[in-house]
Every structure is written in structure tokens, then in C-alpha cells.
Amino acid sequence: MASKKLHGRDFYNKIGRPKRILAPMVDQSELPWRILARRSGADLCYSPMFHSRLFGESEDYRNKVFSTRTIPEERPLIIQFCGNDPEIMLKAAKIAAPYCDAVDVNLGCPQGIAKKGKYGSFLQENWNLIESIITKLHTELSIPVTAKIRIFPDPQKTLDYAKMILKAGASILAVHGRLREQKGHFTGIADWEQIQMLRKNLPSETVLFANGNILHAQDIDRCIKYTGVDGVLSAEGSLYNPRIFLPPSSPLMTLYPRIDDMCEEYLNIIREFKLESDYSSLSAIKGHLFKLMRPLLSIHTDIRSKLAQGCTPRDFETFPPVVAMLRKRLLECEEKGEINEDKDVKESVKDSMGYPVIPWWRVQPYIRPLEVPLVTKRKPVEVTADEGPVKKKVNASVA
């Protein structure tokens, strides 16, 4: 039995009452990206999702997916595991415990690999197993256990599910306001109504995080105001603009930095901590740069080709030349007048949702066409841009 440890709101208070949080992802919330997120305003970060069996059994796997470097600004940190065996998950969690503040159980992954491996959201029909996993970690780990879930179509079932997980011992419950079927082209709009319902019906001491519909920095505050949650996670939104965690009152040019500056800052973090040869830190570098550069790649296709064909994921030195090429190109565009103050982001120029119009040379959210899976059987809802879950004429979705 583990010694007495903080739980629930006491634990949340101890780690600084985080409100702006980098969500767990598959591969893409690795060490240098977490540092970038923290320097961009994130109060708490999750690790990528790790496979509990492989993490517990294979030192080679651990070295490939997780850096044990001691970096003060890396805390607080929650390490997330997927799996379906309480003993195996406990073994992995005990190995991770010295390097984090809590361990999270992934109950939300909707991907095919999770279905095949019987983990993530594909455990949500097996409440007894979930309860046994949470209870095992809660009673035998030296640090708290948390959980991240998706919602059910029936709000009452979502509430009962949340109560079961909390009763089993979860200190924090992160709720992605989408169904298991809402993924890929069918990501759709996250349901803030259900998250608000959980806040109203769970005990006040419950620490609740929300996930979904975070496109811009101001969406974090809107979500907290609308749902009443303690903190908000951003996954995909943070990949396209790490500054999403900054206070929304920050200058627009700070909230939406130039793409070349953002890419250079990311590469400099890898250099600063001498991670050029760290396998786990380089695994997602090409994907990160593609997302940061997305607004301009359809215009400057040679840069896209250079990044796609001229860069080797595990060879750090192949990436700086692409960023240098990008910087040179933007300087040339400035000289030609294609980039100038008149065309830049302004407080006075808003889109139909009330967000700033961002030019192609600045990082910005990815607007995905909205397709809702038939399984949801929901009617369209309308909400204004200053309250509620971003639904009015929204031709977009983002995690």
C-alpha cells in the first residue's frame, strides 16, 4: 500500500491549480514540445500516450518514447498510459512515477489501433475493468491517478460513468466532449453542454478538465466560463499554434507569431537541451513543422517538398535548412510588399465568428470541414461566438 498522498482538489492545488493544459496525444506531446507549450503559457502538460505493456517490459521502448532528463520547467507533468490489465498498468506506472506528478489512464482514444488493442475509448463498455484499473493505481501508486474520457450520447450515462471513475479513485477527470465515433473527418463539434452538466451534477470538490473546440486563446476562458471546469486541455489546437495557452489579452502578434519565428523557437529548444540525438524528442519533429507551416505550404510548395523529401525524422540537422529557407522566403515576400503592416493581423478585422483574420505567414488554427457522424443523430445547434461551444455556422472542428 502506498503512503498517504494528496488526492483530488488538494493535489490540484499543490500543482498550482493549472487552467491552460497541453493535452496528451499520440507521439506529439514529447519533451521539447512540452517545453515550448510551457513557455507559451501552459500550466500543466501531459506526456504522449504510452503503451503500458511495452513501457513496463521494454527498456528500448521506454528510451524511444520518453526522456528521463531532469528539467525543472518540465513539472508539473502527467504521464498517460493505455492498457487493459490492472497489473500491467501498475508496473508501467511505478516505473514512470519518479518522473511525473500523476499517472493518467487513457479512456478516450478512438482510433482503430485502440479498438484492436482493446484500450482507450473501447474500454468504455467494460466498467468493471475500468474500475479495477483506477482502483489498483489509486491504492498502490505513490502518486495520484487521473483519467481522460469521452462522452456517451446519453448524458445520464456520461454522468454515471464519471461518478464510477471518480469513486474508484481518480483525482482529476478530463472530459473530451465528443463521442467515440467523432474522429478524423467526423470529428465534429465537442459538446460543452455535457461537460457543463457534469460540473453541475458532480461534487464541488471534483477537479474537472474540458477538452474540445479550442481554436484560439480566448476559447480557453470561454470554455471555463461556460462549463465551470477547473482547466482546459488543448491538443490539436496547440499543434497549429503553441501560443494558444497565452492570456487572450496578449498582443495579437504575440498570440499569432510568424511561422518562421515559431519554427525557429521550437528547433532552438531542441538545441538548448541538447536533444539533437534524443530519439523520443525527434519522433514528431517533421509533423510539428508541417502543422506550424500549414498556412503557407499551399502557396510555397517548394518548401513543402523540401520538408517532405529532404528531411529525415531522426536526423535533426536536416530540419534547420528548411526553416532557414522559409525565413529567407518571408524576407523576400516583405521586400516585394506581399507581407506588410496593412495586410497583417489587426484587432479591427474579424471573421464571422469574431476571431481575428490571420494572414498566411502567421501560425493559426486548422479549420477542418465539419462532418458529423450519423451515429450522433443530433440536430444542429446555434451559439454565438462569445459564449457556448462554438457552434454557429462553424465550418470547423479542433481538439
Swiss-Prot record:
Molecular function via GO: flavin adenine dinucleotide binding; mRNA dihydrouridine synthase activity; tRNA dihydrouridine synthase activity; tRNA-dihydrouridine16 synthase activity; tRNA-dihydrouridine17 synthase activity
Binding, FMN: 24-26, 80, 148, 176, 211-213, 235-236
Reactions the enzyme catalyzes: 5,6-dihydrouridine(16) in tRNA + NADP(+) = uridine(16) in tRNA + NADPH + H(+); 5,6-dihydrouridine(16) in tRNA + NAD(+) = uridine(16) in tRNA + NADH + H(+); 5,6-dihydrouridine(17) in tRNA + NAD(+) = uridine(17) in tRNA + NADH + H(+); 5,6-dihydrouridine(17) in tRNA + NADP(+) = uridine(17) in tRNA + NADPH + H(+)
Active site: 109
Enzyme class: oxidoreductase
Sorted UniProt keywords: Flavoprotein, FMN, Mitochondrion, mRNA processing, NAD, NADP, Nucleus, Oxidoreductase, tRNA processing
GO cellular component: mitochondrion; nucleus
One biological process term in Gene Ontology: mRNA processing
EC number, UniProt record: 1.3.1.88, 1.3.1.-
Disulfide bonds: none
Subcellular location field: Nucleus; Mitochondrion
Cofactor: FMN
Family named by the database record: Belongs to the Dus family. Dus1 subfamily.
Role, per record: Catalyzes the synthesis of dihydrouridine, a modified base found in the D-loop of most tRNAs. Also able to mediate dihydrouridylation of some mRNAs, thereby affecting their translation.
PANTHER family xref list: TRNA-DIHYDROURIDINE SYNTHASE, TRNA-DIHYDROURIDINE(16_17) SYNTHASE [NAD(P)(+)]-LIKE
Name recorded for this polypeptide: tRNA-dihydrouridine(16/17) synthase [NAD(P)(+)]
Organism from which the protein derives: Schizosaccharomyces pombe (strain 972 / ATCC 24843)
